[in-house]
Amino acid sequence: MRKMKKVLSLAMTAAMTASLLTGMGAVTASAKKSDDGKRTKITALLNSTESTEQYQVYDYLLKNFCDEKGIDYEIEMVNDKQDYFTKLQMYINSDTLPDIFGCPNGTLSKACKDIDALVDLGAELDRNGYADKMNGAVRDFLTDADDGNLYLFPQGLYCEFFMYRKDLFEKAGIKETPTTWKEFEEDCQKLADIGEIPVIIGGSDVWQIMRYLSFSPWRVTGPEFITGYQAGTDSFAKNEAAKYGVNLVYDLGTKGYFEPGFASVDYTSATNLFYGGTGGIFYSGSGQINLAEDMYDAGQIGFFPVPDTEEMDNMETNIPIHAGFGIGYNKATYDDTMQEFFDYACEHYSARLI
């Protein structure tokens, strides 16, 4: 058992700190221009399919803007998240990033910043008058911890929480939603005892497991553990809340609380499983609220926040918020046309989301 825990810890550590090789050569990215030096195309890279929100928004914005300007646009889409990260890293390594690209706030955005590939969008928002119109929580989430600048444009304002099936909780004799992780595991066992899958998870998408690994240190330390971990001043071995998170993931996985074969189930499939009627609990969020609407209105599902880590001092905040998959603008190709597009996006982005 100790060996399995060690393997899990090492796997999670590897996922958090996978080495990111940055390109060392001269910048080779350039805007698509005609012989007379005028831009002819805007390029984009998105972690999307044609049915996802971010693609539909940027396809709408780019189509209308480019039609006005008489230029073309091209959106490269990669659906699988890990494949997308690999593709984005390849562009970073070779300094050939497209004009705009989806980029998570964290290791990959830092890799972009390390090669000076990101436009300071905070300064651009100050210039075009939209700085005060951005939601403060979103701006805080995306603000760079090192220099205080804003390099990513938000996808939106989202919150995350646990959805649960009320009928299964009632059938299992669970009268209240769990407020601690100990209660969470007890409820999982009660669901298993009646032959139901306690928790649905998209285990092949590493971020899903990482959520469970991070819940305890987040509730107890806020951002302190992850920043300390990245700086090399903290570790799973030293931090009790983080150690609790490792044990939690181990218990949920080895006690059969996740669905069979969870490690090969992606997030989309997990979503379809839960909202299709399988499983008692699913970690979801406001980005999927449309899927939950009918079941919620019918009184079939409810939600609860991230539980407390028992016997530790937890912060009051128990609903994570984030800005989605941010958009970066390539500094090397940020010409007058791209600046005009950024202003156009600021003006029309919210209207397109409504």
Spell out what each predicted region is:
Residues 68-78, 172-176, 251-264, 295-300:
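A local structural motif
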